[in-house]
């Protein structure tokens, strides 16, 4: 089984791992109630989407 000839340096290891980060979710303010919600999704607080009430509470 092959093994690395040289030890991987901290810098090289960290450069490779820069792409292993989590993506930040796109949060927007709901125009109806003003609460923060995920973009292109129904608001959990007021149940509206694109100005229409889709979830009745």
Curated annotation (Swiss-Prot):
One of its GO terms (cellular component) is large ribosomal subunit. One of its GO terms (biological process) is translation. Disulfide bonds: none annotated. One of its GO terms (molecular function) is structural constituent of ribosome. Keywords: Ribonucleoprotein, Ribosomal protein. InterPro entries: Ribosomal_bL32, Ribosomal_bL32_bact, Ribosomal_zn-bd. HAMAP family: Ribosomal_bL32 (MF_00340). Belongs to the bacterial ribosomal protein bL32 family. This is Large ribosomal subunit protein bL32. It comes from Halalkalibacterium halodurans (strain ATCC BAA-125 / DSM 18197 / FERM 7344 / JCM 9153 / C-125).
